[in-house]
Structures are given as C-alpha cells and as structure tokens.
C-alpha cells in the first residue's frame, strides 16, 4: 500500500510538472476570473440540497449519497489508493451561512453539508460555471471554523493581513488530521518538511472546512483561529497547494514576499469567492506539480512561528480588499485623459475648419478667439436683422391700419407678434446684463428717475383685450384730410344756402296768379332785426360746433396713448433702454434704429415718403399754431374733462396721455440731435424741421411731465436745427425759438440749468446768432477745451463759445483793437481790463458746464460726458498769470502759478510743444520774482526750454482744429519770453546805469533773444499782427548788443509815431503798435539812447510823462514805477542844464 501510494504520488507529481510547463500562473488566474464572472449564470446546477445535520463532535449521521462516495473515492485515489469504508462516510447538507462581522461572530456556527466532487484525471481542468446556491437556515447545527495565518508581506513597512481559507491537511501517512476547536500552533523543525494542502472544488456560497481522518471520516473545522507569527529567524516550509475553483462571497488574496515582515491574513467569513495560486516574485519560486490523477499540487512557502498566540490576541477586524495599485490607477487615468484630449482636439480642428477654413494654421487659443469673435459678429448681425424685421413688420402694420384692417393690433400686440413668441424672445431683445449676478427676470438698467417699466416681468403686464379707440390715434395724412374737409365745408357751407332758401320761401307764400305785369315793391317785414340775425347766429353756432368737434377729434381723440404695463409699453421701454445704451457706447446707428422703433410702437412712425413728410410737417405747423391760442387750450381741457365719466378716470387718462407725449418728445428730440450733428446719413432739411416741431409740440403737451431744463434744451436744439439747416431763409425762426427758450428760464433765470446759463448772457446770444459755427463736423480733439458729447449740439456750441472767449482774451493782449476815429483813442478801453473781463466770463461758464449725470435720466437728454472743463480752466489760469506778470502783480502771479503747475492729464498725453512752451514760460515768470541770486538763473534756464518748444510748435505741419487760436497763443508766448529776457537784462544792468548808457548782454543771452526774435519773425509771415511786436523787440536786441544807435532810433520811431485810420489799406492797421507798445518804446528810447538823438531836453520829459499816463491806464505798475523814476532823474538834470 505504501509503495503503491508512493508511486501514485510520483506519477501525480510528474503529471503536475508536465502541466506546469504548459500552464502558467496567469492562465490559471484568467480561468479563475472567468469562472468568478459566471456567478449566478446557472442557478439550477446545484439544486439538490440535503437537510440532514450532524453533531459537532464527530457523531454519525445518515448514510452518504453517491456524491459522498465519489468524494471518498477521489480522496482515496489521491492518497495512494488507500481504501475507505463507505459506511463510515457521512453526508452533509449544503446550507450557506449568512455573512457576519468579526465582532458578532460566535464560536458556534451553523452546520452544513459539503458536496465534494471528484477530481477527474485530466491535464487541464475544464472550467464550468457554477450556480449560486439558495440559502437555507439551519438553526440547530453548529460547527466551528479553524483559521490558518499566513504572513507574507508586499511592502517594506510591516503589514498584517488575515486570510481565512478552508484547508484539508494531509500528513505523510496519507491520512487526514482533524483540526480541533482549541487553539493550536504550528511549529517548524530545523528540517524543511513538505506539507501538502489539498483544496477541493467548493460550490457552496457559505461553507465550512472539512477534514478527513485516517479512516476517511470528514469533520468540520471549529472556528478556532491558528495564528502564525514569523519570528526573526523564520524557516520556509514548502507546502503543496492544490489550486481548486471555489466560489464564495469574499476572499482576500495575498502573496509572499522574501523579507520577513509579518503579515497576518484571515478570512472571517468562510465563504470564499476565488482562490488563486500565490504570485511569484523575483526571489520566490512556486513549483507546480501535477499528479497522475490530474490533481494540481503547488508548493507555497509558508513562514510559521514557534510560539503559541492566544486567540484573544488575534485581531478580529477584517481588512477590506486591497485597492488597485498606483501604477494601474495612473494608467487608467492617462487613458481617459487621452480620450478627452483627443475629443477636444477633434472639436477644435472642426471649429477651425468652420471658421477659418481647412488650410489655415493657428494654435488652439487663436481658433477659440476667432470663434468667439465670429459668434459676436453673428449676434450683432442677428440683432440688426431682427430690428429690420421689426421695422418692416411695423410698416406693414401701418399699411393695414390705413386700410382699416386689424386696428387693435398696435395696442396690445407686440408688433404683430404672438404672445408665445413674445414670451420666448423676451430675453433676446433685452439689453445685456451688467454682471453675472444680475437676475434674468428684471432689467438691470432700470432707474429711479424714470417711471418703472415692466420690461421682463410678465406678472406686471396687463393682458387687456383691447384698448379704447382713442388710444390708436390718427395718422398725419388723415389729420390733414380732415382739416381740408373742414375748411372746405366751412367755406362752401350748405347751411347758408338752406337758410337763404328758407327766407326766400317765406316771402313767396302769396304769389300773384293772374296774367299781366307786376310792379316790384319793397315790403317791410314785421320781424325786425331778429329775422336777419337769427340765421347768422345759428350759422356761426353750427360752424363753431363743427370746428370744436374737429379740434377734439384731432387733439384729444386722435392722439395715440400707450397704457402702462401693456405689451406695447414693454416693447417701447425695452427699445428705449437699448437706445440709451447704444448712445453711451457711441453706436449712433443702432440708437437711431431703436428710437425709430420706439416711435413706431407709440403710433408715431417717421414718414417714409415725400407725401407723408409734407402732411406731417403741415400738421405740426397747424398744431403749433393752435397750441398758442389759449382759448383753444382752455376749451379742449374742459371738453376733455367732460368727456370722461368720472374725474378719477379723466385724471388717469390725462396722466397717461401726458406720459405718452413726454416719451415721444424725448425720442424725437434725440433723433433730431443725431441728425443735426451729422451722426446719421444726411437727410433733408424738411425732415430735420419736422422732427424739431414734433419734439416741441409734444413737449408742450406733456406740460409738467417734462422738466423745464429738458424743455429749454428741446427749444434750443430746434433753434440750432433751423439755423444750421435753413440758414438765412428761416433765421427769424431760430431767433424766435431762442427767445422762447430764454422766456422759459424765468425772469431772473432761476430755472435755467448751469450748462445753458451762457446763452442768457448777451455775448452768448450774439455768438449764437451772429457767429458761424458748425456742429456737423466730427468732434476733433482740441488743446483748449475738453471733449464734449459728440451727439449733443448744445455742448458743441458751448465748446466753440469757450474757445471764442479765450481767443478774444488773448487777442486783446497781442492785437488790441483801435478805434476808427482818432479822437476816441484816449477813451479806448484798456487791453488788460478787456482780457480780464473775457477770462472772468470764461471761468464762470467753464465751471457751469455741469457734472456727470446718469445716462438714463429723463431730466437730462444727452448731457455733456464731462464735468467742468479742466483744460479750458488751465488755459484761463495761464493767460491770467501772464497778465498779472505784465501788470507787475507778484502776489497774483504766485497764486495762479499753483493752478498752472497742476497740468491736466489730457494735456500731458498730447505731448504738444505749444503746451510745454506755455508751461515753461509760466515757470520762468514765477522764478523771476525770486529775490535770490539763483532766481534769475533759473528763470533764464526755463526761458531756454520754452524757446525750444516754441520753435518746435512753429515747425509742426498739418491742419489743426484751431489755427487762429494757435497763432494768438504762440504770439503771446513769444512776446512773454522776449519781455522776460528784456526784464532780466535790465535787472542785471542795475540802478547805477545812467540815462543814455547801455549795458551789453552776454553772448548766451543774445543768442536766446535772437532765437526768440527769429520765432517772432517766422510767425509774422503767417500772422500779420506779430509785426507790431517785431518793431518793438528788434531795437531791444540792438541795444543789448551795443549796435549802431542810428538804426536803433529809426526802428523805435516806427513805434513812436502816431497814426490815423484814414486812408489806410486793408490789413495795415493790424501792424500798428498799441498803447502799451508805444509806452514801452518811449522807455527804451529815453533810457538807452544817447541824449543827442532827442531834439531838446524837454522832449524827453514830455515823452516820459505821456508814457507814464499810458502805463498807468493800462495797469502796468512795474513799468509805470520805472518811468516815474526816470522822470525824477531827468527833472534834476534838466534843472541843472536850464540854470
């Protein structure tokens, strides 16, 4: 028996060896996974269930079944042919146990019978799907389970894993040992003992581990746990493991590692899902043996400790399944990311082909940017097409209205759109939200200054069936037709003929019926004066009733009224807000389209043909004339109040009518502003006049609903439109509307806004009516005024008026106007005082421009985009500082220099050389006031820098927006630099210099003076008034250089001679010197020319006295003091000479 068993074992080992050469661990693992995936596929395979139970101590039970016999036979063959007694075999019922946690596990468990299938003798076992058994509880049966702890590790850190697996232990004597319920320990010897662990195919969901004794008796394993802990010195015991396919609920798989890290593995639930052979590492060889009967045996090294561990110290928790490795997760993530990237790249390529074509080459960000730009372009095109479609639908609706078809569609229908379309497209026509947090249900652009409008709130929109016919209004052609018919009816009234026929019939009541002739006679009537007055009174009464009815029809019932919170009102406010946004952005074409849509919704569409324009213009002229008659207004108001049933209804309807008139007036006013400023394609003059009259008429009808400032703006805009469009033909109408606007300001101009206060001044009115200004030219950037609103004609005219005041102030300094008559020269106004008066007015008008106002405020229509004009204020301060320095007012120079020193950002950005020249000239004037020694040197340095910038400004070519203002500013700057250099030279000469003596200047001073004089000569070629300064400063440079005094005296004589305006050619008067130039020339001649050049000593004194009077009248205190000192010196010398 022993030899046969040994031979059988060797054959089995040879078969396992041959099978191991053909199969690998991966193949076996793949087969096991395949079988594990088939769980639940065949539920009827193990439908046979046995219900017999057995006691836990190894007591006998019922007789075994055929499956038990085959199982015993298989075991005997596996043991080398040892026979077993079939009567001793036991049969067990196959009952799965429910899964329980270690904390709730008890030592006693339910008993179950295992159906053991024999292992056929084949090289490769055939894998078949196993059904999942049905659980049947066995409350009486109890058994215990035994656990073997295997301690391999996978990582460097010690880890503990517990695996519970059913094992059948077979000793060397080919007999099975019964594992007892108590705690046991496996101790290895110094020699490696082969241990064979045979695992049978288990197909029960929850099964117990059975062992077979030497006599073939199978016993259940108790739930005792055997723990093996690897000591520091561990010996490997090769264990033969027969891998079988086991389907249970859970399994924790572990492998062995070569290091000695203790890993505790246990299976709390004996129901195993699969069992695979341990993975083979680099240092661990797992040989696989195949027996003769096809049994696969695998040796697995097991590290076993030498000490017993109590069961209480065994950890009861069961670790979860080991998560997938980091490398596997990373690989899966990379695959998914690669798919995502591929999909995104494909879509970007497709987007590039759609937007730029297949041949274009561009990176991904460029493709997305181009796509976004193209989408925005499509949105804009779609918006414009939608607007055009809306206008066409409204025009079609207007034609239907004229034909008497679908009269109620303009009131409560959204421009011939269905209510469902309105609800679907409610967000398409609304302006974009200002930020992402704005609610989509309300308009983010509603304001408090205007009446609330339910732009997007359907709950506030009234679904009224139809408005009264009075809300529809009449078109202008119908109004004119009614007026013409009324005029013809009154001119050719049939009532007059009827009354005359009735009187003739009364006189012929008793005619003569006989034959013969009758004599004409006059019969006196008995009625008296009542007979002939009654028909006349009756005729006038009937005609008055007819005319009054026509007025009521035209001015009350014929006016379109839009009820609040209706579909038409919602549409109007949506386009109105969008127009305001377009105006703020500068998209004037889109703003005009939205305003035209607003007027169409209000029932006041713009005329599209010449006939419509003629009828509309005629009706507005008639209406404006009727509104000026107070009797007509009073009668209409009384009739309107009587027409309504109750006072509350009349007041509500009157308020709605005024609100509709106000909205229409503002829309007409804004369209008129866009037309006269040239922001829209050029239209006819009649169209501009028509819009102006519509705005004025409706604004007057709105009465208190429209603010007074807006009403004044509407009249001023109408005046500007008539002046620019009609010119001299209808200039009286422009003056009429200007006077009308001034009368609206009140007697003391209390209600006039600050931005319009300049028109109440006589200079402003004169500039408005007499000066030629253009508002259709594109708004150019100016060095002298800040940028105004390009769509506001009043702001542009105000800008032109400010520049005109600045030009007048500078011209009064460099080009004083002389009187025509020589006798008036003494009474000529001082040039300094005139300049200061202009600058004072300019400063007040600049401050009254007004601050920034809300763009959607109904009280301000297209206000200026800026507050006070800081640029014009800076120029005002600079010119005032120059006048103060010329007058010798040092305190005023210092006070104004603090304002000039803060140059505005807008002027710094321009990098204009003229601005820099003026700035450094002001710094030079301020430095010259310093009493220190370096003050004159600093002033000289600033003069040099200002001279360089002035020369550059003269060399700048190209058209400028204000050429005349540039010339006078350049002339003033050049004159200031030359005067400043002369003053510095005279200071260096000192008080020790006597009369007739000359102090020669240095070469650097002469070079700077000659450079500025060259700039003055160059400016004189294009600006003739500069010659008067040339004749004054050329003698000065000759005196500084010590040149021939004869030529110097001849040049001074040009400024000293008196001239009259008689017999002078045109343009020569501009070259005549003014009073200040003549006084300055007298000072130079009397101080620096030799005494021999004057004819007599008395002549010098007379000239100095005249110069002192002139300088005192001008206000030049510094030069006047110098003149008086010279008179004192000259008086002493004259007395000595006379004695």
UniProtKB/Swiss-Prot annotation:
Residues 501-531 are lumenal. CDD domains: bHLHzip_SREBP2. Residues 1-479, 553-1139 are cytoplasmic. Residues 90-104 have a biased composition (Polar residues). GO terms for cellular component: endoplasmic reticulum membrane; ER to Golgi transport vesicle membrane; Golgi membrane; nucleus; SREBP-SCAP complex. InterPro entries: bHLH_dom, HLH_DNA-bd_sf, Ig/MHC_CS. Residues 48-104, 119-143 are annotated as: Disordered. SUPFAM superfamilies: HLH, helix-loop-helix DNA-binding domain. Residues 328-378 form the bHLH domain. The record marks 466-467, 482-483, 520-521 as: Cleavage. The record marks 460-461 as: Breakpoint for translocation to form SREBP-2 fusion proteins in srd phenotypes. The keyword Cell division does not apply. There is a cross-link at residue 462 (Glycyl lysine isopeptide (Lys-Gly) (interchain with G-Cter in SUMO2)). Pfam families: HLH. Activation by cleavage is down-regulated upon activation of SIRT3-dependent PRKAA1/AMPK-alpha signaling cascade which leads to inhibition of ATP-consuming lipogenesis to restore cellular energy balance. One of its GO terms (biological process) is positive regulation of cholesterol storage. Residues 378-399 are annotated as: Leucine-zipper. Belongs to the SREBP family. It is linked to Sterol-resistant defective (srd) phenotypes express truncated forms of SREBP-2 protein, often found fused to other proteins, as is the case in SRD-1, where SREBP-2 is fused to an out-of-frame KU p70 protein or, in SRD-2 where the fusion protein is a LIM domain-containing protein. Srd phenotypes are resistant to sterol biosynthesis repression by sterols. This is Sterol regulatory element-binding protein 2.
